[in-house]
Amino acid sequence: MSEKNRVKIPLLTLVPVPYLSIDEAEIDFSAKIVATSKQQKGKFVPLYASTHQKLKQRQTSTESLTSR
């Protein structure tokens, strides 16, 4: 006596990947804002200010040498 089994799989898994392409997509996005806050702006101090300054000086001196 043979036993019957039924398996359901999504149709998408049967489509070969090269034949699957998306020409256009539409995404709906909604959000609920429950709170807001205000932050004061302050000065931004780079972490490696001295290194940045040295690199800037080197670049300037290299440019002045090549412009001669």
From Swiss-Prot:
Pfam families: DUF2589. It comes from the Archaea. This is Uncharacterized protein AF_0415. It comes from Archaeoglobus fulgidus (strain ATCC 49558 / DSM 4304 / JCM 9628 / NBRC 100126 / VC-16).
